[in-house]
């Protein structure tokens, strides 16, 4: 948390360069965690948050606003289903639920108000496996991102970005952490989605909450690919505050060290059963 001079400080706050400015937004320990999970997922950037549930919520409100729609699989973790079915509508965001076993169900539910598709790579608790490539193609054909909660498969077993997902969410509390000693979540940005395609007013119009910045247009070229994560960091996270404890970030970094050993054993046990 060093400002070399006033120009350096202005550049940090103006997002002309990256650095630690305030621990709710950026923390050195959490930064290591974000980079490590992003590397495991093959993503461009990550954002640590207080829980997987807050990661899902921030992912939605970071691209959708009142009057918009999300199309989601119906076989979701109960907390996510409640968030989508009961909470988001109070913010004016409507979620349409579809049977994900036929990816064309997503296509049939998309309208000009749809801002994203959502699914879980392996559903919680039903263990249904999503056809990520097929769902991602539907999203791509309509110029919208696919958001995947990949908590149950972890990056050791599945990399949704390789199959076309734009955003990946994890509850770190479960298999990535592995030891039940912390609560947290992380959102990974693939860095490949075009937020300037005309479908996202939140990225085209000036943001009054951040000096009139247009997230899809005004970032310097090195930062433009991770506009989604930068906006999530400086709008929802900064202003709503569901930040991860740096101590929990450290605990998750220790847990990730044993992820391959634990996932191999989980798979061996499952095959035996």
Predicted regions and their residues:
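Conserved N-terminal alpha-helix of the aminotransferase class I/II PLP-enzyme fold
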Residues: 3-54, 79-87
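Structured loops at beta-to-helix junctions and adjacent beta-edge loops in soluble globular domains
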Residues: 1-2, 255
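Conserved PLP-enzyme active-site core in the AAT-like
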Residues: 45-273
